[in-house]
């Protein structure tokens, strides 16, 4: 359907907006049915929305109170958090300020979630309309982008779901290429778009630049000399706009440096990449994935982190179109083949640094060198499919507008392809508790009082409730990209993160943490209290059931014995306890006639020799799929490089363990222990420990050890001791030495 004139364009735009709005309402109908003021998009599957709800409240609050918007001590109190390393969406927060002020941040979040698919689809529609000059094909193209598998998977991540800028960037470039807008207007619009995109998601800002550069390079390669000459003008002006955006954003960008995470990424990109099968087989994010065969297949295969790559039958059209393009063979530039090439590049990069098939790593991929570049290595390849769906949206619009083909073929094939990717509804659940929504907390708390809300971090919703209170209280905890070092150094924090706080000495560990962070109250939702009742009972205070929560006022006398406790001292106590438990478990494991080669945390747990809180869960290999690591790990040159990175704290402990010369196998766990064979007659026992704890462990057990590593795989040396994140303290003992090791508790001075 081609429509000429202003009236036709307005009619097409109105039809597109109406269709997308209806589709958005259907996609988010669980939230609308429950009530925009009470339900939360993404709940109960995810607690991630609290980050965005908090951000929507924080930026207006910070600006109106004259606070630094990129730093807060209202979470992770009293030390605070650098918000440059968060996903708190400052641009949408400022846009929604009036609504947040009137109705609260939960309503703002839900409205943005409702608007997001429509807005993203509409900007893609505009791009497709520019490319095809046909309304109906453009409407289909916009739908494919705005209601893609990616959009459904990221629906509860507003920083990733607000994807209306990338189509605008492409359209501005094409308008300038066709000389339909002037130089200054193009530069200003590109500058504004890039700046807004950064303030929504620095990750999409970076990847949009990368894939934009790839698209331009591919066009340069395919095009003839005349086209390349035309390409220079928008390329030059885009570069100017990018430079201006970087300058304007430099105060924000400056806050990224130095990275608190070293050279290694926050999350391993190999663990959040697209699986080859993920492009073919649907997940429960698509209606096709709800079919019985798809559910069975999904359980067997598993698609890993953020499985957004399912494209249904859309790539079939792209391939068909590429091999039978509209362009005549004499023409040098085929838009269809260009788009197919671009889609292929995006798919390959979305596979990440390691290609996975049904969750099994099979080979390194071309994204591997990106791991060498800080900031860039934090981009998760599974999210690159965003640009694949944008490419497909334009491809499908072109296909539908190709009058050379049979009209029934075009529309029936496209309809089948669109049906194959139709998303399921985004879940929603009640996200309010009367204690917070009805302001009951004002009767129990003072302004700026520090509270601890359980469950902790991403297991709970502390930041959401703090935002709903208008930042009435501070929170000892929070949930952003990572837990700050000054929190993570307390042993109870990793235990709470694992949602299993009952580690050795948990009562004292909990009270010491509360004392150090000036916590005067603990709040637990009534529905979660059973899991934490034993922990809260250590406070010896009355549990008050009010407004859907259990409120516990902390008695200062209970915490008084821990007033001078430090994280280092509690870490030392904790690891002395753990090391003794591991020695005892090893001794009993071998004493029962088990083979040394079968010793690991999980075999000991199965025999009842280790509690689940000590044993932890199996760790996911950080270097899985990098075959050269296993080949060269024992070489002196490789170990020299690894030692330099580890000694300068450029990589974290889990990767450091795998870069060592010894094959770890099942000996380590998520709880931060190492227990297993070292040689045929020697065992390795280790714990994640800070420098003070490591020194104490060495003094107590070192005289009977054959070797001591800290941080592993480096030999123990006091010259490397520093107040940093816990590292693996590993000791090697001969089996014959086990009976001589003292496992009895020893009080600290």
Where in this protein do the model-derived segments appear?
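Hydrophobic alpha-helical membrane-interfacial segments at the cytosolic entry of transmembrane helices
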Residues: 13-21, 192-193, 229-253, 266-271, ...
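Membrane-interface coil-to-helix junctions
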Residues: 23-120, 143, 148-164, 272-297, ...
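Hydrophobic/aromatic-rich transmembrane helices and adjacent perimembrane loops
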Residues: 310-313, 362-403
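Extracytoplasmic
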Residues: 265, 415-749
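Start-transfer (signal-anchor) and selected internal transmembrane alpha helices
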Residues: 1-31, 236-243, 330-340, 749
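Hydrophobic, aromatic-rich transmembrane alpha-helices
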Residues: 217, 244, 311-350
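Membrane-embedded helix bundles of polyisoprenyl
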Residues: 20, 112-131, 135-222, 238-253, ...
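Periplasmic/ER-lumenal interhelical loops and adjacent helix-loop junctions
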Residues: 43-62, 234, 242, 247-323, ...
